[in-house]
Amino acid sequence: MSGHSQFALLRQRRFLPFFAVQALGAFNDNVYRQAIIGLLFYLGIDAAQRTLYTNLAPALFILPYFLFSALAGQIAEKLEKQKLIVITTTMEIAIMSLAAVGFITENMVILLIALFCTGLQSTLFGPVKYSILPSVLKPEELTGGNGLVEMGTSISILCGMIFGGLIFQIAGSHGPEAAATAVIAIAVTGNLVARLVPRVDAGAPELKINWNPIPESRAIMRLTRRTLAVRNAVLGVSWFWFVGTVLTAQLPTYAQLNLGGQQDLYVFALALFSIGTGAGSLLCERLSGRTVEIGLVPLGAFGISAFLLDLYFARPGAAPATGLSIGQFVQQPGSVR
């Protein structure tokens, strides 16, 4: 395996269609969320209400993860995985059709309901995203394959946020129609690609699903507390996504007030964050020696915390100058840090 490269997986049907499906899903989620923000500017919503919606949107998206993750895990164990991927991408088409109605009618209530449903669809897809890899990859390919998936997710999030943020700027008065068309087209593409994913047998087809998520969630919490490695991994991964969600939600305000930048500086900062996430994902294979090394997770969580603390001390207050372009910002003292 000395000549093994994780990128070789991208040429294989057992991996590529799934990789494309999850990347398209992450891309569409972020196109949709950023297009909602674009609609707020298009409608001339005041800054206070924009801030409210900007923080409410990720909360509504994440809430289904908290409520239904245990149930989603059971469903992923019971159903054949390719079938479940097709089901969830079909759900995405229906949800984005509802979102399209919200865009065209400029109705924020419909858009927020669709956003919650998008979170629910992503919750159902999540367990498949992680459980399918051990079924289609060899043990020595798992870390590299997972790194590729995380890299693809990071790049898709970045591209989705940029594209979604530009829809209303490019389309102008046709912004609502353009946003509606985009999210439906991406969802349909994802569903078509999902049908190319090879069949993978269900993990526990005889499992009787408990539709009450509360006892299942408690059972998972008990298992997590009993197993130190699992507990550390859960805490580390949860911390990563918590920090990522908070940063991406607050980055527009931080780039403007603390960095003194224009819109392009926000996109630049977002790109650096996403590139760093993708690079770290790819490095996991080399750092772990192509084995599943769970000990890297708490180390990564510690690194996130340390660099966040340094970010605060690098610019604890308001920017000394405003309206800076990327070129002007990098010439400011301390910009490299």
Tell me the role of every PLM-derived stretch.
Residues 12, 48, 78, 104-105, ...:
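Helix-loop interface residues and adjacent transmembrane-helix termini in multi-pass membrane transporters
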Residues 90-106, 302-334:
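C-terminal ends and interior cores of transmembrane alpha-helices
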Residues 35-46, 98-105, 158-183, 257-258, ...:
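Transmembrane alpha-helix termini and helix-breaking/packing motifs in multi-pass membrane transporters
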Residues 16-34, 57-95, 110-169, 187, ...:
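Substrate-agnostic recognition of the 12-TM MFS/MFS-like secondary transporter fold
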Residues 129-131, 135-136, 140, 176, ...:
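Helix-loop junctions on the cytosolic side of multi-pass membrane transporters
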Residues 34-51, 249-265, 269:
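Short amphipathic helix-loop junctions that connect adjacent transmembrane helices
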Residues 50, 55, 108, 166-187, ...:
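A membrane-interface helix-boundary motif in multi-pass transporters
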Residues 1-16, 200-236, 257-258, 326-333:
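Juxtamembrane intracellular "pre-TM" segments in multi-pass secondary transporters
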